[in-house]
Amino acid sequence: APVRDVRETLTPELARDEDTSLLLIDLSNGLDRINGSVLSQCYNQLNITSEQNDSDPLNGAAGVAGVADVLDAGMLKAFFELMQSRDLRQQLLAYHDRSDGGLFAALVEMAFAARMGLEIEVPEVESILSFLFNEEPGAVIQVANDGVEAIINRFEAVGISCQVVAKPSAIQEVTIGVEGDTKILFNAARSTLQQRWSSASYEIQKRRDNPACADEEFQALADDLDQGLSADLTFDLNEDIAAPYINKGLRPRVAILREQGVNSQVEMAAAFHSAGFSAIDVHMSEILSGQVDLSSSGKDQFQGLVACGGFSYGDVLGAGEGWAKSILFHEKIRGQFVDFFERKSTFALGVCNGCQMMATLKALIPGAEAWPKFVANRSEQFEARLSLVKVEQSPSIFLNEMAGSHMPIVVSHGEGRADLSHAAAESLRGDSQIALRYVDHDVEYTDQYPMNPNGSPLGISGLTNDDGRVTIMMPHPERVFRTVQNSWHPEEWQDDGPWMRMFRNARVFVA
């Protein structure tokens, strides 16, 4: 079915609220068939019967003969239609299906996402193993305790079984008990289970990637204090500081610059357009052929220049370097860029591949002489994730009045590590040229993977020149300037994400 509004979707991440319950919606009429399940495959028993040997690890887990399947299409349809009702969805806090590993896998995956514990309580059944590990059609939902009875009644009214099976806990431990019995059948730390759950990926990662990074990521799973992503802003998220200038009806021209292999120009143009600019698509071939002149004046004058992300020339000449060399080694084009960068009324932004390109152009940019080159990530892999960054105090016109804020941002690069010594990084910090830095869950600057996805010293993720008109960064603010673009965000964020402020700051700069 089409997703008509991404704001109405649910994820398996539990709401960190202990006054809630997890409900199992069973679409199999309690059959609990376990043949062909992940559990049966783990024990290499793909045809479990009721006559298992006493020594068999799956003895007593036979359930009903057969494999999980949809037997009642009408029930599945009724479930789908009920889940689409707006009033029900507004009561749901989290959702996960049980078809990949069974109920236990679904429950602990929800706990992993929220870094919480669980108190699992199963009903009196013939086989607890079959109940917890069958992969029959079904789902788990999280709801507030005061709405449990009404929601159960709604599902039962259409012939679907629905029951409470777990409660979240701030104590990071997963326990299993039987309804009406105080005896605990199983208990384990959330961290232990999550490391076991991740162990196969960890072993592959150690062999494929930098093993030190694999170790750091694996050990981080055991940190019970890590509550994941967060956001704290030093500015009013909902204030449109560019509104007075947009209302004048004038739209300054900004060149959205791209080259063969660049792929982020559309999002970038949308962000600048939303901030009140006239975003002009400019391909390097147009500059090289003379169709576009960055030195133009009058109505054709550009007040902004933005180099977008992607993989110019497939990075085969070094990330961003082939793009930069087409400028550096072309006397006329080089002169245009020099004139543009030296004009005090202009600004420039380089993101991802554009950051790498502009770092290579540093000889043309006043006050950027100390910028580093960007090289392969410490992990030795392409990194695509949502990372946490903190805005530094710097002269960057893009980050004006944002210093001290920390919030998530998209990273997507293979060569994002700032190649400079610790002393050189400290020198940049002393000159207030570090604009953004990666931080951990304590909002402390970090070199640890994956919080620092590329290994840049001092967590460097963005830089500015000495007068702040030119800013470069490896993360992608244009991919998260709207709240709905974020895969995680605080509930109170409305239409605009915090990175929209960056583009509005540019509009205020040119007035």
What is the role of each PLM region?
Residues 3-133, 147-253, 261:
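Intein/HINT protein-splicing elements and their conserved insertion hotspots or analogous self-processing inserts
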Residues 20, 303, 471:
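Conserved acidic residues
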Residues 65, 180-351, 355-367, 375-383, ...:
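N-terminal beta1-alpha1 cap of cysteine-dependent amidohydrolase-like domains
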Residues 118, 162, 279-280, 470:
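Hydrophobic anchor at the start of a short beta-strand
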Residues 135-144:
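Short cationic amphipathic helices and targeting signals
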Residues 161, 345-347, 469:
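Proline-centered loop/turn at the N-terminus of a beta-strand
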Residues 165, 292-294, 338-339, 371-511:
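Amide-donor transfer/coupling interface in amidating biosynthetic enzymes
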